[in-house]
Regions:
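Metallocofactor- and cofactor-centric catalytic cores in central/energy metabolism, strongly enriched
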Residues: 18
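Right-handed parallel beta-helix/beta-solenoid
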Residues: 1-6
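Acidic, glycine-rich low-complexity segments
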Residues: 21
Length: 275
């Protein structure tokens, strides 16, 4: 597709299809992506701006968003996953502009309302305040407990203020082999937060010039503490990764990359156009 109107039509249509996006398409409002869609950018410079990509109320969704440039949307979220399962967000470049007002943009990639089985891999997320929220409210535990199982791996979080991710209730959220750089935009900047008894495994990540790598036992803002296990991380000119308690085992097999090669792997391989 090469127009926003065609993109919206194809993304919202019923049935399985692969949608190839040519060029940067500018739109507005929300595109409600329907089930069984693979959305891929062509080359390194294709994508979407000005609109929210909504993936909601589908079990399973079976949605892939890959190799897209996605811009922050003033006053709105960029990608909103809500009450949906089986979604892969891979090799995208998600970026905004650093603004003085933290509410100028909403979330870049928010996962809420008991969404489940989500993988976020090999993305560049840059220049954003409210990066990625998992679980939207301290009061939503009855819906969220036992869900919000999300994996983040081989992403580059660059100049993000916070929420990379911020997790309530989800277990186990697996955050491994990501590179965090210059997460030090103000005195409250942090990378990861485990809250409201969430359970996170944080392993093999590189934190470079990060004000606070992780919050857990202390809670954050008005949210109660969560649990966090950290292992084999590298902290370079960064604040600590606070740990607390134990978490449930990861329910899949995987091989974590040695932390010594994570920065070079991620900076070379993450982002749109690098499939």
């Amino acid at each position: 597709v090469s127009t926003f109107a065609d993109f919206r039509t194809q993304a919202q249509a019923a049935g399985a299809r692969t949608i190839l996006v040519n060029d940067m398409l500018s739109g507005s409002g929300t595109v409600a992506i329907s089930a069984d869609k693979a959305i891929r950018g062509v080359g390194a410079n294709s994508g979407i701006s000005g609109t929210t990509l909504g993936i909601e109320d589908m079990h399973p969704a079976n949605v892939i968003i890959q190799s897209m440039n996605i811009r922050g949307v003033p006053g709105r979220g960029a990608i909103q996953i809500e009450s949906a399962t089986h979604i892969w967000i891979d090799h995208n470049t998600l970026s905004s502009t650093i603004e003085d007002n933290p509410d100028y943009y909403d979330g870049m990639l928010d996962i809420t309302h008991a969404a489940d089985y989500i993988t976020v891999s090999w993305n560049v997320i840059r220049n954003h305040w409210k990066t990625s929220l998992v679980g939207h409210s301290d009061g939503n535990g009855s819906e969220d407990r036992g869900h919000l199982r999300v994996t983040y791996h081989h992403n580059w979080f660059d100049h993000t203020f916070e929420r990379s991710p911020r997790v309530r209730f989800g277990e186990t959220v697996h955050v491994f082999n990501n590179y965090y750089s210059d997460v030090d935009n103000n005195a409250d900047s942090y990378a990861i937060a485990s809250l409201m008894n969430a359970g996170l495994l944080v392993e093999g990540n590189v934190f470079e010039r990060v004000r606070q790598a992780c919050w857990s036992a202390s809670g954050y803002a008005d949210s109660d503490p969560g649990r966090l296990v950290a292992r084999d991380n590298s902290l370079i000119s960064s604040g600590p990764c606070e740990v607390n308690g134990t978490v449930a085992p990861i329910p899949y097999t995987y091989t974590a990359e040695a932390v010594g090669t994570v920065k070079s792997s991620v900076t070379a391989g993450a982002g749109a156009g690098k499939l």
